[in-house]
């Protein structure tokens, strides 16, 4: 039997609400596709001047729905928006100006918004993208030739064009609060060139398929992410910069718990415009394969005025990675004025994500436990770094039989100037705690690096450092 729910349209004016009248009938049996009915309800509210669309308990099977200015979508407890597993139910954006490297952003999503203002998604309900089933359908349709993906990744045998859970492009005054969000086919929540964005109290469980980032903020201004729980098969909370003429500016990430098969909080790797005035604090990290904090500026952008403090990371592959690189040809990056303080991290001997269904890819060489690298490139140093009140416990147990880079050969560590940035990118390193290279002005204050077992390497190795203070 087809179940239905009556939607009431409410106009929000200040603290008051005005009932506009009867809404539309939307199936919520979880089997009947209701994309058209949901879109009709959203559009009707927009045409009335704005208001709230409340979804009662039930399951709403839908393809892509587009948010409109002035509309709040509220999911009551027990309400689930369930993404269709048919890729034909999703919009595909192919505009060449979507980003400097558009292959990484499809613009396709379950919840889509373009150029809207004053939009909110709230409630105690759930949005489920059914990402695994959707991704496998996309993969099958590519191989049958029905929907070929021109950028199909044959090395990893998976499609690149997969819908995100959210995609908001050039939007203003956006709030997303309290919802449970899960199982995207691609990235999770994507906000591109948006302004005045608030994400709070979210539970993001995005482990359905490869490249399942949790939250991606791309060249946005005035962003607040707070009190969120994120479990992602790729980066947890990731700031990206795809637009050379823009940057992420005035972004705060606060009081979040993150578990990741990649890095917990990451800047990059896309870094065309850069990251400025970013504040990350009070973050708990656990069972994370790569870095607790990764700051990467490698595509010619400018990264400036970064403050990271009060980070508590357990069972995490690396505490900190800061990298200035040059993937963008002649255009050099700038990375300066970075403060990391009150960071604690426990690095295990084995894989932090050993019990995950989707695990991060291993490197293809033998190595001992990696130190935390902070590395610029020749002629382009990272500038003005402060590490203060840092505690990192390493497992030790390094052996020369596994891998050996003696101090007298530290000049043989490859620069990897134009390579993909990752804390493992340099191969075996000659230290166990910190590896510092090509830096102008770095201060280490109250640094406590410890070993659970012996390690034959020195704690810190530095090369090409101008202005080194250690106290």
Per-segment meaning from a language model:
Residues 18-471:
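Extracellular/periplasmic carbohydrate-active domains that bind, remodel
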Residues 1-23:
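Bacterial Sec-dependent N-terminal signal peptides
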